[in-house]
C-alpha cells in the first residue's frame, strides 16, 4: 500500500487502519471506558497524523462514518468539512454515538458548523445519554475556542 495521501478513499483508509491496529491497544481502550466493540486498536496518537496526511474530504468522511468502525469514525471527525456537513448528517451521526470518546471528538467538528447553536439546543433536550453529552461537549469546546 502507498503512503497516506489526500487521494485515499475511505476503503484505502480502512485497509490501512486494519493493518496497524493491535489487540493490546484495543484492550487498553476498555480500561478508559471506551466502547471497543468495533475498535481496531489504534490510538489517537496514530490517527491524528494520518488525518493530517489524508486531509479533509466531506464525502469520504461520510463513507468513513458509515463503516461503523471506531477508528474510521474518528477519522471521519478529523477529516470532515464543517462547512459542508448538513444538519441532518450531524443528527444522524449523533444518533450513532456510543462512547464519550466519539462524542468529545465529533463535537469539535460540530462546533465549527454554522448551525452549531441549534444542535446544542436540540441535543441538550435529548434523552439519549451520548446525544445529550454532545451538547455539553460542544459548549465546552466553544467556550475555549470561539472567543
Where are these regions (language model features)?
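Alpha-helical scaffold domains
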Residues: 1-147
Amino acid at each position: 500500500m502507498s503512503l497516506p495521501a489526500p487521494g485515499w478513499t475511505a476503503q484505502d483508509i480502512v485497509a490501512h487502519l486494519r493493518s496497524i491496529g493491535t489487540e493490546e491497544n484495543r484492550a487498553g481502550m476498555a480500561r478508559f471506558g471506551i466502547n471497543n466493540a468495533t475498535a481496531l486498536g489504534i490510538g489517537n496518537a496514530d490517527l491524528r497524523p494520518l488525518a493530517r496526511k489524508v486531509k479533509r474530504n466531506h464525502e469520504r468522511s461520510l463513507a468513513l462514518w458509515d463503516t461503523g468502525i471506531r477508528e474510521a469514525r474518528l477519522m471521519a471527525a478529523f477529516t470532515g468539512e464543517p462547512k459542508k456537513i448538513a444538519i441532518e448528517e450531524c443528527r444522524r451521526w449523533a444518533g450513532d454515538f456510543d462512547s464519550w470518546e466519539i462524542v468529545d471528538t465529533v463535537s469539535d467538528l460540530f462546533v465549527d458548523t454554522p448551525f452549531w447553536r441549534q444542535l446544542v439546543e436540540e441535543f441538550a433536550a435529548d434523552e439519549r445519554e451520548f446525544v445529550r453529552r454532545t451538547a455539553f461537549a460542544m459548549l465546552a469546546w466553544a467556550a475555549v475556542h470561539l472567543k
